[in-house]
């Protein structure tokens, strides 16, 4: 006869309690995530070094006292932000101040001195070919020295550098005496340099072997006597852009780092006078962008020059403009392009005039960040005196009138062995900005950098805690599901074991005849309080 089993499985009470505890934990977690952070904020405010917030964020309801403290804190915070914004705007304007100072030194480097005779060509040195080629440049008619028009002779192409070198005033003939700091000097101490005035000469132009002076005052610098050779000046037939109506020399005092730009920066010295030039060295320091507009020494140098200077920049601009318009360069311009011939002079003058009219729009020359210049004070006395005119006349075999019309004395010296420093400085730098903001922060809200770190640390902890509480329920649900699956597996295994055991016992009873064929014993319920399963069987 078939046997029917009716089985009821009941889990232990502790499993029910564990499930209840898990539900309770979930409810408490939800309550914790929904609870306001008043207590946490109050705890942070009581421990923070930020002034005032410990009176605002307190446990309990918001009262009048907390409201007044909140208003005071907001007003202080607004004032701090206003002052901090003003400081930031002032810093972004990049202001600077100029500091003037004077420093003494036991010795000073003597400046370079460039001199040029205002007359560029000696009339006695010109050949018929020179006069023919230089007609457009000098204004002289294309005639030979006898006043006749040249025949059909073919003159060779002119070499302007050779013409300047050959027909210019020679220093050996002009220099009558030379003295530097009590020691004699000569024309060999000068170097040839070409300018808009032709062949010129520079004293102490080599910066590697520059001369120094150890005393200030007259007689401790350069003193030279020159003969300007006025009788050899070119006759003026008509005025051109290159002719000059003056007599004398042009002088420029400059540093060894810059080329002479004597036609614009030089000063004139006339014959018949002794000119005293008292110099004061000035060392200027400018600020680069964004505080100033100077050119840093780290930037690319101008081709042909070792050091950047305004004079070198201007010469470079003139060279590029003449090359663009006339496809040549003048003798004094740097480069290796072809030198312009006298027939190109009109084109050159036009190009330079256009460059000058542009007022620096096409060629902007920045001021170098480090610059040396020389302030000058000039004074003059007439020479020769009546007593010295006769002596000089006999000494140089010239007439007294010639000496009055051609001789001059130039005396250049330092006023004192000191120099001025004119330096641009940042009026408001990063250190000043941080100091002002820190002072305003401490004055209005009593905070510091560490206070800001406290606030950031609190915000980090709050965000971290919120994220952990949002992710914790998911982990708890997953863990609970795994526990239920494990419990179900254990119950199934126990049930199978019990079925197998009961089947073996009933088979053994049938074989022994211990119970009736129609009635089986009915087992009572057994309640167990430990981690075991209770069951009922009915047939």
Swiss-Prot record:
Tissue range of expression?
Expressed in central nervous system.
PROSITE patterns to which the protein is assigned, alphabetical: ASC
- Per its UniProt record, what InterPro entries does this chain match? ENaC, ENaC_CS
Ranges spanned by the short sequence motif GAS motif, renumbered to the chain: 446-448
Spell out where the chain crosses the membrane: 69-89, 433-453
Record keywords:
Cell membrane, Disulfide bond, Glycoprotein, Ion channel, Ion transport, Membrane, Sodium, Sodium channel, Sodium transport, Transmembrane, Transmembrane helix, Transport
Task: Kindly name one Pfam family recorded for this protein.
Answer: ASC
Instruction: Give yes or no: UniProt keyword Cytoplasm.
Output: no
Its activity is regulated as follows: Inhibited by the diuretic drug amiloride.
| Source species, domain of life | Eukaryota
Region of interest (Disordered), ranges: 474-494
Catalytic function, reaction form: Na(+)(in) = Na(+)(out)
Report the SS bond pairs. Answer: 116-200, 178-185, 294-369, 313-365, 317-363, 326-347, 328-340
Its function, per the record, reads: Could form pH-gated trimeric sodium channels and function as a postsynaptic excitatory receptors in the nervous system.
The name this protein goes by in its record: Acid-sensing ion channel 4-A
- Species source reads Danio rerio
- Encoding gene per record: asic4a
